Amino acid sequence: METHEARIKRMRMRSWRRGTKEMDLILGPYADAYIARMDEDALNVYDALLEENDQDLLAMILGQQEMLPQFSKLLAEIEEFSRGRLAKG
């Protein structure tokens, strides 16, 4: 059984080491900022999101593909976080 700390560590690592650099730069900072504060339900959704294909996720975030219903709220939060982060830079 994976401990909570091990799960967070695994999910952060998977957020930074995706299949594409674009998704590394989107999910990595988001995970650093929010994953430690997520409740169990939010962690389950984020963990499932990490199983999705990077090209599909990027297309959903960019509005080029319809968001999967189970991820729509989370992807909207990630998109807002990323846009805010880039606006500061």
Q: Across the structure, where does each feature detected by a protein language model lie?
A:
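Positively charged, polar, low-complexity stretches
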Residues: 2-89
